[in-house]
């Protein structure tokens, strides 16, 4: 019933024509900021000196200041590192006053200044929101990890970047091949991870060298995307073509024979076509014995300007990744075994291969200054193959108390194709005295997954899946096999998923201080309707099809007593059509999610420091998670075999701090508290903790740039501290199993400190990073069978030249 009430609220709001108090007669000031070579200048501050009101220019260089009193004003145009510009302007009542500015810098010079980080936490809009809304007007917590942060911290993996976001963390690295991310108590699965606004398969670590920024929307994003899990949404934004000629060549070397050359080139092909090509190659050994990796990445893109109003951006990327599959150390009776950090327990020939390719076309058409159409067409294909020894404690083959472990074999091949079509109309208009920022959209996507299963039967040992026996404490105790057996392909499972959605969202400025965000999405999804082909008896079995449809409403209220304080609250309801099947290969029922969020966003000391605090509660009616056992009661290794575990409730509090550069200093900090428990369940103990989620996380980084400090000019340095609290893994105790042997396994907390230093001289730069300075030890864990130690102390050095 609540959902339908909210739908009605949205409809009423969208049709209002004047029910709030009328504004006094006012004027509007708008214009554009350009570089001296005529290009739009984004992220430039525009300030009215007399009344201390301001804004920031958008990507097209435009700015707008509304509800001004008639009078004369002094406009001050500035950005850290640029020459400021002042102009006097007179604004008449009920008129639109237009004025344009031209900076003294060209586009290249502006790009170099903006990247140094002149924007605060509440200045950074997220493109994943589909409509650009100022964070102070948004009743939701968002974070943007900008290019300058990625560069100065020398991020190599996504986990490095997420150390700047409280409450978002890596909880597992199953097989050493991926980074399983969680937030606010829930996992960010494939449906919650995006690249340039299109869903992205996160079964492999994404390549960071091609990224411009990382966007995080915490909490619900169901109205915008549909079928997303509760914790939040992650959007990876790649580097874009530019109409100025340039680029960078870099080479990175580090501990354990890490070598990574990278090339980034961009420039104009003609007056209306620009290009960018970003490519890298990475090869490394590991602190883990016998483990190595190799990856190649290329990301070409073209930007076509079809007149003044239409842009077409075509982006492609290809990632080839091959690494040793590594399921970490051992656990004995749900306690992590005391083994050397470096000890590898798999076969030396084990591998995990990924080939992933994406093609996306984004068309933007500016109808006029207020309305815009945006279309995304995207295709992605992922081929993933795993072959190696089974995980410790999987398939019933437990590590014994004396360290003996009977190893089996596992192999899987998965091919996934993903298609997306999305169309959005965004615009601004007024009804009476109320200003609307409207989003209307529709999307349709399709997954096709083909998964091959394999079996290994050792006829010499009773037709069991037994490869050999090792002792985890003493690898010399037994003679280890090193041959690669042939595994028989048993079944092919073909699973299509079709989804379509339509949505509307409206941000309504009821008064200058009160804003209402309301939206609703209708989603329809079909899961299943595929088949299972048996290679041995050459039979095909159709799978059941499950279809669901639902409305997902959203309602948020923002109160801004001043321009520097925003108090907000919001409610959203969504449903997740769960992928995968139960142990009997039947489709899963959907999960319904209620989310409540409230908080305060502030800009302090003349907008030099942002400080935000957020509280939330998320209730998942029936959480789908990987099943602990298969249909035969054995330990389950297939991530597509799931169970519905019952109601789970997550409660938490988050605190964020971010400064703009102040005399060379900048600061990022945060703290998160979370408690996620089973609140209704017939499967697990009510009140027991959901696995993998730390109750406390915290982060703090301080960075200093010596740009104007005499002989130290060009030097910069910073330190990052990151804390992850205790959490639990293992297997939750089942209430319906008498004397259940399953139990939770505690994972220790850890503090990690990283130190970075750099030097820039003209076009040359040299950067060094020392990570995990104090050599802290903890683990990324999945169940009790992929317990991967975090990396020890390491050093890396990067040399680069700008072109």
Name what the model sees in each region.
Residues 643-732, 798-802:
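Gram-negative outer-membrane beta-barrel transporters
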Residues 39-42, 47-52, 66, 80-82, ...:
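Acidic, small-polar-rich N-terminal luminal/periplasmic segments of exported/outer-membrane proteins
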Residues 416, 435-437, 443-447, 493-620, ...:
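Structural signature of Gram-negative outer-membrane beta-barrels, strongest in the C-terminal barrel
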Residues 364-368, 372-378, 382-388, 566, ...:
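Membrane-embedded beta-barrel scaffold of Gram-negative outer-membrane proteins
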Residues 282, 286, 299-366, 370, ...:
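Acidic/polar loop-and-plug regions of large Gram-negative outer-membrane beta-barrel proteins
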Residues 621, 667, 722-739, 758-803:
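C-terminal beta-signal and adjacent terminal beta-strands/loops
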Residues 210-212, 223-300, 306-310, 357, ...:
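Outer-membrane beta-barrel translocator/receptor signature
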Residues 6, 21-111:
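Periplasm-facing N-terminal accessory domains of Gram-negative outer-membrane beta-barrel systems
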């Amino acid at each position: 019933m609540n959902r339908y009430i909210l739908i009605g609220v949205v409809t009423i709001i969208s049709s209002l024509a004047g029910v709030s108090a009328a504004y006094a007669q006012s004027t509007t000031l708008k214009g554009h900021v350009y570089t001296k070579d005529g290009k739009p200048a984004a992220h430039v501050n525009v300030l009215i000196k007399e009344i201390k009101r301001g804004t920031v220019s958008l990507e097209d260089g435009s700015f707008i200041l509304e509800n001004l009193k008639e009078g004369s004003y002094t406009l001050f145009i500035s950005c850290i590192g640029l020459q400021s510009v002042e102009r006097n302007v007179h604004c008449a009542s009920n008129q639109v006053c237009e004025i344009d500015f031209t900076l003294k810098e060209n586009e290249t010079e502006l790009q170099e200044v903006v990247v140094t980080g002149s924007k605060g936490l509440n200045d950074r809009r997220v493109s994943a929101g589909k409509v650009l809304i100022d964070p102070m007007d948004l009743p939701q917590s968002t974070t943007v990890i900008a290019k300058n942060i990625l560069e100065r911290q020398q991020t190599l993996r996504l986990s490095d970047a997420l150390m700047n976001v409280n409450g978002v963390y890596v909880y597992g690295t199953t097989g050493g091949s991926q980074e399983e991310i969680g937030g606010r108590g829930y996992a960010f699965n494939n449906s919650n991870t995006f690249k340039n606004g299109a869903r992205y398969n996160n079964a492999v670590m994404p390549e960071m060298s091609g990224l411009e920024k990382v966007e995080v929307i915490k909490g619900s994003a169901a109205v915008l995307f549909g079928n997303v899990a509760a914790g939040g949404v992650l959007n990876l934004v790649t580097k874009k073509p530019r109409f100025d000629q340039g680029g960078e060549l870099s080479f990175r070397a580090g501990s354990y024979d890490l070598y990574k050359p990278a090339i980034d080139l961009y420039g104009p092909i003609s007056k209306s076509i620009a290009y960018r090509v970003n490519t890298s190659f990475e090869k490394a050994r590991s602190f883990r014995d016998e483990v190595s990796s190799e990856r190649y990445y290329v990301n070409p893109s073209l930007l076509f300007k079809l007149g003044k109003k239409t842009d077409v951006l075509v982006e492609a990327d290809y990632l080839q990744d091959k690494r040793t599959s590594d399921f970490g150390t051992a656990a004995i009776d749900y306690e992590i075994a005391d083994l050397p950090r470096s000890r590898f327990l798999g076969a030396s020939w084990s591998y995990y291969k990924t080939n992933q390719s994406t093609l996306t076309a984004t068309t933007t058409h500016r109808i006029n200054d207020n309305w815009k159409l945006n279309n995304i067409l995207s295709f992605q294909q992922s081929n993933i193959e795993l072959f190696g020894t089974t995980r410790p404690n999987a398939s019933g083959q437990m590590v014994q108390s004396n360290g003996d472990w009977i190893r089996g074999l596992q192999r899987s091949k998965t091919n996934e194709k993903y298609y997306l079509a999305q169309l959005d109309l965004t615009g601004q208009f007024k009804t009476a005295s109320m200003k609307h920022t409207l989003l209307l959209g529709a999307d349709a996507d399709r997954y096709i997954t083909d998964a091959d299963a394999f079996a290994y039967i050792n006829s010499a040992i009773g037709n069991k899946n037994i490869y050999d026996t090792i002792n985890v404490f003493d690898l010399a105790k037994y003679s280890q096999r090193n041959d690669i057996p042939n595994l028989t392909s048993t079944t092919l499972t073909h699973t299509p998923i079709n989804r379509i959605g339509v949505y509307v969202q409206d941000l309504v400025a009821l008064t200058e201080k009160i804003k209402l965000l309301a939206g609703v999405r209708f989603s329809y999804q079909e899961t299943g309707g595929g088949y299972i082909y048996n290679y041995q008896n050459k039979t095909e079995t159709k799978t059941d099809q499950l279809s669901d449809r639902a409305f997902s409403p959203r309602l948020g209220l923002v109160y801004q007593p001043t321009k520097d304080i925003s108090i907000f609250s919001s409610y959203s309801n969504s449903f997740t059509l769960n992928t995968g099947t139960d142990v009997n290969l039947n489709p899963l029922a959907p999960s319904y999610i209620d989310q409540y969020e409230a908080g305060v966003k502030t800009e302090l000391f003349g907008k030099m420091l942002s400080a935000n605090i957020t509280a939330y509660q998320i209730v998942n009616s029936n959480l789908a998670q990987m099943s602990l056992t298969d249909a035969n009661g054995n330990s389950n290794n297939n991530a597509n075999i799931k169970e519905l575990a019952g109601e789970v409730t997550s409660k938490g509090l988050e605190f964020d701090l971010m400064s703009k550069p102040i005399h060379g200093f900048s600061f990022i900090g945060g703290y998160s508290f979370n408690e996620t428990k089973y609140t209704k369940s017939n499967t697990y103990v009510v009140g027991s903790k959901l696995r993998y989620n730390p109750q406390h996380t915290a982060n703090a980084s301080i960075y200093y740039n010596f740009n104007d400090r005499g002989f130290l000019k060009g030097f910069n340095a910073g330190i990052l501290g990151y804390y992850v609290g205790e959490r639990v893994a293992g297997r939750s105790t089942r209430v319906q199993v008498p004397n259940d042997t399953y139990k939770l396994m505690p994972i220790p907390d850890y503090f990690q400190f990283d130190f970075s230093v750099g030097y820039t001289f003209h076009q040359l730069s040299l950067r060094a990073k020392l990570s995990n300075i104090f050599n802290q030890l903890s683990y990324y864990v999945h169940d009790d069978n992929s317990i991967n130690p975090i990396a020890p102390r390491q050093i890396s050095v990067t040399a680069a030249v700008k072109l």
